Every structure is written in structure tokens, then in C-alpha cells.
Amino acid sequence: MRNQIGSLIGLLLFSGFSSAQDFPKVSFANDVQPILTRAGCNQGACHGAQYGQGGLKLSLRGFDDSNDFREIVRGSIGRRVSLLSPEESLLLKKPTLEATHEGGKRLQLGSPEYTTLKRWIAEGMIGPSAKDKLFKSLEVLPVEIIAKAGQKIKITTRGTYEDNSSEDVSSKASFDSMNTSVATVDNLGNVIAKGPGETVIMVRYLGAVGVFRIILPFGEAKGLDTFAKNDNLIDKMWIEKWKKTGLSPSHICTDEEFFRRIHLNTLSTLPNPEEILAFKADSNPEKRKLAIEKVLNRPEYVDSWAYKWGDLLRNSRDVLQKKGMWSQHNWLRSVFRDNMRMDNFAGELLTAVGSPYANGPANFFVIGSRDDWTETACQVFLGVRMQCAKCHHHPFENIAQADYYSMTAFFSRVAKKNSTEFGLQGSDTTIYLTMAGEASHPKTGKILPPKPIGGPVTEDPIDRRNGLVTWLKDKNNPALARNFVNRYWGYYFGRGLIHPIDDIRITNPASNPELLDALAVDLIKNNYDIKHLLRTIMNSQVYQLSSESNVASAADGDNIYCTHFRAKRMSAEQLLDAVDFACGTREKFTDVPLGFRAISLPDSKFSSSFMDIFGRPRRVATCECERSEDANMMQALLLMSGNLLNRKLSETNSRISKFISNKVPMDKAIDEVFLATLSRLPRDQEKKEALAELALAQNPKEGLEDLLWSLLNTREFLFNH
């Protein structure tokens, strides 16, 4: 027994002496956790799953050092580590397959990672300590490179700690390519360029995330001379991007295409035939610029954007009741009627109090509670999806669980109570402030002060939310402006500079980050005037490109680089209104006067199977993904043989019926049908074929109805192109 004890003491003394002389002590937080992360041990598909695997439950990607230390050292009755025989530890034997392991081989015997884990065990398995160096930031170099296929690049990753010391952490960091067809990366940061395109290599270390961007040009950019003469900020910055990617733009769209496009994007409305013909005949070289000003000041502008923001704010009678729904809708209309500054728009919503029936913005706080308000505010006004960080460190962003609850602290003193201001049947709720209420970390119980993502602690003695709004409106903080720019870019181009448009994060970089930053600065400089942004977008030649891709732009199939306009199907509401417009009819909705267009409705609960089939959202989520753009067989059947379309085509006061009663010549009737659907005159061959079909019809009315029906079923009608 004495010999055994003596041997153990000698082993411990020797281990301590050797590590102290030759190496610093292995840190669980800074050395062990990165190894487990690189090996995939704490990933969602392995021991980082909600309930772990094989009896071992680790925190997802190693963001909870204390819990993981307990699990490894004390869990399973201490069988996972052996101080007497470190190499016999299950922590080493399973990942090297010296013991059965369902997760496969994760470590090589004798590798640096294996040696580090063995040393940590031999040194006594020192756990997380206040003496551990606190990690501060991650630097990834190079930031960006334009490469050729087959080229090899080495990523250097440096970590900086709170004591300002730094080290190369490339051997500890984790590397992942976001698109392996463009570039691959190994676990040491060695990148191999593969095929044309652009991607980022995501680098993770101790909760920090960084990226390296690599571009492999598609070819050589051509046809940029005409763009070089344009002073538009957007055009200038896309020229530079096209040069980097080796892409070339399509030609400029026709006047009719442009006119239709700005009406659908800005007003959710088709232009009428008279307007189209007048615009086409106008010889003024500034006519496109003038047309943009007109649409920005049309009353339909208010309808369109009030409806869109009603989607994002979940304006619905199901939760808000009818009075709350109308209150918020009318307030949204006033916002866009008066062209309210968008930073003030955010501020009024986030600091609202009082009766939601009397104060539209207060409805923001009727839906859900503190956590929901936090997630909605972040997603709608910052474009950041915070839901992951509620339970663990965000896996693809530098957002910790503490950041989530620091954000909730802004809303921790907001409360709601029932009110009788509108009578006992009013179901009104009053939003008010309390003097108490804190946010605490769910694991440590620590009280967290109000602090925005990436910002400083911002206290306000009266209303904590004022601190958040002050931070959002700070001219030196582009976060709010970047979100608005990216959202509206997505609405106009069919794809955000960051896509999806409400998923802004470091590992989902913009297709043109310099342009996004420049437009955000420009929006701030112009007092968050959203019409200024839309004016800049629509006046750009990039926006006015044809939706037809040429040989040079065909490589940009998803239109990530805006080499052509991305054709997009009309929304459910736009499509119903467009069908009504083309047919000369009006859909009657319950509880509102005849003449209310679909795009003018306050919520999505007005009965319409047509709009539901075409993807109208239920308004239960703030995610843009709630609106479905997917095509399906029911949509095709509805357009080809549905009762709604047949009814509208044959109505007594329809466009076709008026042609017949007014004895409009067939050639003029054909012209108007084309203008009312495709926003252009028929081409010579189309006109010839239409006249021939009408001559074969049983009567002119039936022939014109068939023509209109056929045009309503074309892609050219259904899509904004």
C-alpha cells in the first residue's frame, strides 16, 4: 500500500514539475473546449444535442464551461477520466476508437490534440477558473481574396485576450466552408479554391466567429462603359463588384417593363393603359425620373407599405381585436402618408404606452411578452434572428445567451393590464411602465443591465426602452439603417443584399457589403427618408436592367450580383387586385365598402381562398418566410378553371362587357386587353394571331374573354419582371 501511495505521489509531483517547466497548465476553457469543438464532440448531432448522446450531454459548441467540466470529470461516476492512467480515460479512448464509439474516430493517437487532452488529465483536470485568460476578439486574415481554381490559401487566425495578449489560434479554431463547390478548407485553415463563385470560410473559436471571403471570378466583366457614365451610387458600386466577380450585366429594360415594375414594386398596382401609352410616347429623356416621383406620391403608396408593415408587425384581429387592428393600420397609413422618418417610426413603436385602441403603436406590446418583444424588435429593426441565443450561444454569430437577456432587460419593466376605457366588451389592454423588473441570466441568475447587441449598457431612469431607441438612432450606429436598406433592397430586387433579408449575421455576408454600408450611411445622412432610398434604387441602371439574362449574366442564375432583374411572382394581394384590374371588376370583402382593394385591407383575415392559395401570410410570425412564394398545382388549377376567374371574366360590368356594349373595335379591344394585363401593346404577330382567333369565336365577347383568360395565365402577367 505504501508503495502504491508513493508511486501516486511521485506521479503527481513529476507531472506537475514537467508541465510547469515545459508548458503552461492546460486551460479547460481555452485549450480543452476548442479541441472538443474542432472534433465535433459538442455539435448538435453529437453530445451537444438537446439530450446529449450515449449518456454524455455537453453544451452546444462548448459555450458552458462549468457544465461541460462537471459532465466530463464527475459524470458517469468519474469513469470518463483517469488521473492514474490518463491514456485509459474514455475521453481519449472513445474518440480514438480504442473503445467502442458510435460517433466514429475523432482524434488521432499522439496528435497535438490528443497530447493536450492527456496533459490536462495528468495535470489534475483543472477546471474553469477566474484566473483563466478571458477571450476578447478573433482576427481572421486575409479578409478577402480573389483567387483562381486550384489556388491554395492559408488562413491565419489570431485570438486576443482581455489582458491584450494575443496568439495564433489556427490550430485550435474550427473552420467551415459555406459553399464547398467554391472553396474547401481543412481543420488547419488551409483553403483550396475550387470553382467560380463567392463564399466565406467561417472560423470559430471560444464563442467568437469570423469569416474569410474568397471570390473566384466567372470570367471577365464586359459592357460596363455605359454604367461608368452614371453618377448613381448603386451603379458605381456594382461596377466594382462585377469587375471582381467577372460578371456582366444584361441590357436596360424597355419603357413598358420599367413602368410596370415601378408600379408593382412601389404601389402594388398595375398601371392603367392610358398611363402606359402616354409614358411610351413621352420623348423627355428624364421621363423615367419623373415617373418615379409620381409613383412615390400616389395614394396607393400608402396602401402598399401600410399593408407590408402590417405583415411584419402581425397586425391581426385574432390577437389585437378589430379595434386594435384598425388602430395600428390607421397609424401605419399615417406613417407612410406623412413620410415619417424611419428611425422615428421604430422609436414610436418601441416606446409606446397607453391604450392600443387609441394609440396604434401600443399594439406592438399586446402580442406576446418580454421575450417575444425582444425577438420581434431584433428581427424587424435589426434583421437579427435572436431565437437561438435564448437557450445557448448563437452558433453562427457573436451573440451570447447573456446578450439575449440583456436585450430583454429593455422591456422588463413594460406591463399590460385590462382596461374598461372602451367598455367591458372592448377587451382593451393598457400598456404601461412599472418601477421594478429585471432580466437575469437563466443559468447563473446574474442580473443583466439593458444592453443592445454589440452596444454599450444604456440605462434610462424613466423608461429603459429610451436607451435602446437612442442607440438605434445614433448617427454613428448604422445597424438600423443597414436593416432598412437591406429590407427595401429585397422588396425591390426580390433578394436582399443579405439574404434572407431578416437574417443579418457575420456568417451570412452581403453580396455587396460596401454598397450596403454606403446606402446605410446615405440613409442616415438623409434623415432616414425612405423615399430618398427608393428614389436612389429606382433611378439606378441596376434596377432598370432587363429580367432577361444574356450569355454573360446567365452565370448569375440566382441574381445574387444583380446582373439582371429578378422576376418575381406577384404577391397574393397584388395578384387578386391585378386580376380585378384586368377584368374591370371589384372584389367585395366583408365589413368594408365595395372598392376596397386587397392591398388596402387592414389584416389577412378577410375571407379569400384565392389569396390563401397564393401564399397570403396568417400574420403569426415576423419572419419574411411566412409569406409563401412557392408555386403549386392548386394555383395553376385556380387560374385555369377556378370559379373566381370565370366569374370575373363574365361579370355584367366587366372590361369585356363594356367593350361589347360600347362597340369598341376589335383591334383596339385587343390592345387594351394586352395593356391591362401585360402593360404593353401586342406585338405584330400576337395581334395577328389574336384577330384570327377572334374571327373563329362564336361571338366577340366570348373571343375576348378567352384572350383575356389566356393572358391572365401567362408568366408575363403573373410575374413582376
What is each model feature region?
Residues 1-27, 114, 118-152, 158, ...:
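Post-cleavage N-terminal segment of exported redox proteins
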Residues 20-114, 131-158, 163-231, 260-261, ...:
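Solvent-exposed helix-loop boundary motif
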Residues 79-82, 459, 627-628:
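Short Gly/Pro-enriched turn/cap motifs at secondary-structure boundaries
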Residues 583-586, 591-592, 597-600, 604, ...:
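Long, His/Glu/Asp-enriched segments that create or flank divalent metal/ion-associated functional microenvironments
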